[in-house]
Regions:
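Charged catalytic cores and adjacent phosphate/nucleic-acid-binding surfaces used
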Residues: 1-62, 115-116, 120-125, 136-155, ...
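Divalent metal-dependent hydrolysis catalytic cores, especially in the metallo-beta-lactamase
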Residues: 52-58, 67-79, 90-110, 188-190
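Short, acidic/polar
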Residues: 82-94, 205-214
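Loop/turn elements at helix/coil->beta-strand transitions in domains of secreted/extracellular proteins
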Residues: 99-100, 124, 185-188, 219-221
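Short, well-ordered beta-to-alpha junction loops that form the rim of enzyme active sites
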Residues: 107-108, 192-195, 253-255
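Surface-exposed amphipathic alpha-helices with a cationic face
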Residues: 117-118, 174-190, 238-247
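Binuclear metal-dependent hydrolase catalytic cores centered on His/Asp/Glu-rich metal-binding motifs
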Residues: 141-188
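Arg/Gly-rich low-complexity intrinsically disordered repeat tracts
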Residues: 406-410, 415
């Protein structure tokens, strides 16, 4: 597969990237301000071995006691780290690679973390961004809206969120919102994880939804996302789709735990505005898959779950336990409250749930990764060497031990 607009670096060990670029750009990461919906819980809980048995018992017990079903439609959880911690972790990984860093935090439908970061490190001018939930027909999409103008960020984000959460949506309103974003040259609108059936409507219905969405709004989408928490086979399909549409590619790590993003963009730009022009106008992109991305996805997901669910003694009371960060409305009139406000105040929940959490932590440990390597499908194994530019003369000059080494069958080509 030879792409015209993208160069891809696949690193299998840490490397100095200062000869490849000036700046590393980390997109799509989440902080304590990001409300992560839990409406998927019943869907997956019924499919997980062992857990499904206890889940059904709890569900039936709740129905018997309350006379109604468990309702996760409004329930959400919050990632454990504050914005400064997330920013510092992302910045360090990029700096350790010999690059200047730009970090774009994208909490769900919220710019609070960005505003606070801007106050704390204003001299670095971090972009003000968010992951915007865009309702569409019978589903929704997530659009990374990066680098809102600081003087208008609150105003624009309110307009976007009024559309997301408003009871009535006017005809043509979404067109107007996308056009508004497109008219701001330094803003980047990214369709995050486009092939993921996140709305759980089924693969074919999601494809129909995506095709219709792109037909209507694709001209205002500046890039598709290669996502750090999606399978390689899916990301490869996104690369192919971007090529067919003539749309640029960017990365999005989508981190929620304590580890840095596993994918970043490389650029010669010094500011996010310059980077946005590179993507929007020049339509060229340079991407690095960090060594951690090559690790089995299921193992990385479980490790992230374990980080999300562990105890953080250094955090303030009311936020250091996982059940302080999970909010649920049990229908008693008290609205959404942390689980710790219910009967979990002095305990860690039912024993079966404690056991399930321990199991997640065990299987998410690095020691268990060999097991996941054995069960990993061939199509999801990331190539061992970088196949990023097709310049055979350049490849010939690289050592076999070079983490950026290429072979003669480039995955991505510069023309």
């Amino acid at each position: 597969m030879n792409l015209k607009q993208t160069r891809l670096h696949i690193l299998h060990q840490a490397a100095d990237l200062s000869k490849e670029a000036k700046t590393g750009v980390s997109l799509h990461c989440h902080t304590q301000h990001s409300k992560e919906m839990l409406d998927f819980v019943p869907h997956y809980a019924e499919k997980l071995p062992i857990i499904s048995h206890f889940w059904k018992k709890e569900r039936d017990r709740y129905r018997e006691q309350k006379g109604k079903e468990l309702d996760f439609a409004t329930a959400f959880w919050l990632p454990p780290l504050v914005e400064q911690e997330v920013y510092d972790i992302e910045k360090k990984q990029i700096n350790d690679s010999g690059l200047e860093a730009i970090v774009s935090i994208t909490d769900h439908d919220c710019i609070e973390a960005n505003l606070q970061i801007s106050e704390q490190i204003g001299n670095e001018q971090p972009p003000i961004s968010m992951e915007w939930t865009v309702p569409y027909l019978y589903g929704f999409f997530h659009v990374g809206v990066h680098n809102l103008p600081k003087t208008r960020a609150v105003e624009i984000s309110k307009q976007l969120l009024d559309y997301t959460f408003g009871e009535e949506r006017k005809s043509g309103e979404l067109h107007d919102l996308f056009a508004m974003l497109n008219d701001i040259p330094e803003v980047l609108a990214v369709l995050n994880h486009p092939l993921w059936d996140i709305e759980m409507v089924g693969k074919e219905r999601h494809k129909t939804l995506l095709d219709n969405f792109l037909s209507e709004y694709g001209k205002w989408i500046h890039a598709f996302e290669i996502n750090g928490f999606r399978r390689w086979s899916e990301n490869k399909a996104v690369i192919e789709m971007a090529e067919s549409f003539g749309i640029s590619l960017v990365t999005g790590g989508d981190r929620h735990g304590c580890k840095p993003n596993t994918v970043i963009n490389l650029t010669a730009s010094r500011t996010f505005g310059e980077f946005a022009e590179e993507i929007r106008v020049d339509k060229r992109s340079e991407i690095a898959l960090m060594p951690e991305y090559r690790q089995p996805l299921k193992s990385r997901q479980l490790q992230s779950f374990a980080e999300i669910l562990r105890f953080y003694p250094e955090h303030p009371a009311g936020r250091n336990r996982w059940f302080d960060r999970v909010h649920y409305d049990n229908g008693d009139g008290g609205g959404l409250r942390p689980l710790s406000a219910y009967s979990w105040r002095f305990a860690n929940g039912p024993l079966w749930l404690q056991a399930a959490i321990w199991t997640l932590g065990f299987f998410g440990s690095p020691q268990m990764r060999p097991f996941f390597w054995l069960t990993m499908e061939a199509k999801d194994r990331v190539p061992k060497q970088s196949l990023f530019d097709g310049e055979k003369s350049r490849a010939a000059n690289r050592s076999a031990d070079d983490p950026l080494a290429t072979d003669n069958s480039p995955l991505v080509t510069d023309n």
